[in-house]
């Protein structure tokens, strides 16, 4: 997974170099935006290494769970986690992104373990607030009457929501409810027993982690 993340900044450098005649060495200032949690863990640590390899480049990193308008706000590249909606943007898929419902063992002992997504209404669900990027809710793979399966989006409620995914993660680790988080964030906690995955049989297929550019000419 780290290798996929390292490709991100290389893609940015190649994109900027490609708009120069003859593929001249990348130079100038890059503005990159990424989701706060993913950016802190996987993008920010790579910036110094990237700049060491590209000494004529400077870089500003914006971390926000808001969906940024690249063209209107002057960004050269965005990292997007999830489904892409704007087909006018150029994109490079970096890695798969799988999400799971997780909670602490203590929370599940107190409140029980949901066996079906419909039972989430009985639980304290920790959700991103409406101004964040997760507008469709939590995705689940549900059986159909025809014997197949379809992805259904639910918007569970709870006593707390936040626009910052790191806060939801912290609340979940503190035992305040069930959160729907990416495996890159919680797989270590699951392995260590700090968090337990629930409703795994209903987990939706993975979507993607992408590098997004204002124009396909960068690809």
Locate the predicted segments by residue.
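Central regulatory/effector-binding core of bacterial HTH transcription factors
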Residues: 27-91
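Short helix-loop hinge/linker segments at domain boundaries
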Residues: 10-33
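C-terminal regulatory
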Residues: 72, 84-209
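Hydrophobic packing within well-folded, soluble alpha/beta domains
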Residues: 50, 59-61, 171, 195, ...
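Solvent-exposed beta-strand sheet faces enriched in polar/charged residues
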Residues: 18, 33, 60-64, 198, ...
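Short, well-ordered beta-strand segments
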Residues: 31-33, 78, 126, 179, ...
């Amino acid at each position: 997974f780290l290798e996929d993340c390292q490709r991100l900044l290389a893609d940015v450098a190649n994109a900027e170099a490609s708009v120069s005649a003859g593929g001249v060495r990348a130079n100038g200032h890059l503005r990159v935006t990424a989701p706060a949690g993913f950016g802190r863990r996987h993008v920010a640590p790579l910036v110094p290494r990237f700049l060491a390899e590209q000494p004529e480049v400077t870089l500003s990193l914006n971390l926000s769970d808001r969906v940024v308008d690249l063209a209107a706000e002057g960004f050269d590249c965005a990292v997007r986690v999830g489904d892409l909606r704007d087909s006018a943007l150029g994109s490079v898929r970096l890695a798969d992104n799988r999400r799971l419902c997780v909670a602490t063992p203590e929370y599940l002992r107190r409140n029980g373990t949901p066996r079906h997504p419909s039972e989430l209404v009985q639980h304290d669900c920790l959700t991103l607030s409406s101004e964040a990027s997760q507008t469709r809710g939590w995705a689940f793979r549900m059986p159909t009457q025809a014997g197949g399966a379809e992805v259904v989006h639910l918007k569970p409620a709870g006593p707390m929501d936040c626009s910052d995914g790191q806060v939801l993660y912290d609340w979940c680790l503190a035992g305040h409810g069930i959160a729907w988080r990416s495996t890159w964030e919680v797989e270590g906690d699951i392995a260590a027993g700090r968090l337990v995955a629930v409703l795994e049989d209903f987990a939706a297929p993975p979507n993607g982690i992408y590098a997004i550019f204002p124009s396909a000419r960068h690809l």
